[in-house]
């Protein structure tokens, strides 16, 4: 079976940054399973998989615009500390989910000053070209329910135990996808800008 829209695909992969740093992988014995054609992977990888079959191995370089986008300076904001309600200590690297006009947005603290902090809403891989090494492990026809929902169904939830909540970008899992699993804190009203952040 060739990979095409509405085919469920299992892939083993490694993904590295331009400087060779391994940022994610799924081995053959624990492959990533997804539904093709529903934006469950970064678009550059999904396009490269189109027409492939079980046993195919390949490498593909994915430009930022077909991965996690270019780095956007407008996604970096300085906000007052007092909007982070219920957080005892703010430190660089803390992650929050900000409720914005465009929906939930993951942000990370990149600087902490006396009265304010800098938060960055860019994806950690924004602006980077990614190298994927991929092997197609299995394919099957999707169920009507999977097609209707736009993602696979399996015991334990999406991708082996994760729930169906997702960020604004998609429903997949793993670095090759857009799924977001950081739920430590929640920010409200525009990237922690107006209302506040809380657990």
From Swiss-Prot:
Listed binding positions for Ni(2+) are 173, 191-192, 197
E.C. number = 5.2.1.8
Localization (cell)? Cytoplasm
- GO molecular function terms attached to this record: metal ion binding; peptidyl-prolyl cis-trans isomerase activity
GO CC terms of this entry: cytoplasm
Annotated GO biological processes are: protein refolding
Sorted alphabetically, the keyword list is:
Chaperone, Cytoplasm, Isomerase, Metal-binding, Nickel, Rotamase
**Which Pfam families does this chain map to?**
FKBP_C (PF00254)
UniProt region (PPIase first part), positions on chain: 1-69
Q: Which residues form the PPIase FKBP-type domain?
A: 6-95
Q: What's this protein's family per the entry? A: Belongs to the FKBP-type PPIase family.
Question: What does the entry's free-text domain comment contain?
Answer: The N-terminal region consists of two globular folded domains that contain prolyl isomerase and chaperone activities. The C-terminal region binds nickel ions.
Provide the protein name: FKBP-type peptidyl-prolyl cis-trans isomerase SlyD
């Amino acid at each position: 079976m060739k990979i095409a829209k509405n085919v469920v695909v299992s892939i083993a992969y490694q993904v590295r940054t331009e400087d060779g740093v391994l940022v994610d992988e799924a081995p053959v014995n624990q492959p990533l399973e997804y539904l093709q054609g529903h934006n469950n992977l970064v678009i550059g990888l999904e396009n490269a998989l189109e027409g492939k079959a079980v046993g195919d191995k390949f490498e593909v370089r994915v430009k930022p615009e077909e991965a996690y986008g270019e780095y956007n300076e407008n996604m970096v904001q300085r906000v007052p500390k007092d909007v982070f309600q219920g957080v005892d200590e703010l430190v660089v690297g803390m992650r929050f989910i900000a409720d914005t006009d465009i929906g939930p947005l993951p942000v990370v603290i990149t600087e902490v000053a006396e009265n304010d902090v800098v938060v960055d809403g860019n994806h950690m891989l924004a602006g980077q070209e990614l190298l994927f090494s991929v092997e197609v492990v299995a394919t099957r026809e999707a169920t009507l329910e999977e097609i209707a929902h736009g993602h696979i169904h399996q015991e334990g939830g999406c991708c082996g135990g994760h729930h169906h909540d997702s960020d604004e970008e998609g429903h997949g899992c793993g670095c090759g996808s857009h799924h977001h699993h950081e739920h430590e804190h929640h920010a409200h009203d525009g990237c922690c800008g107006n209302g506040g952040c809380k657990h």
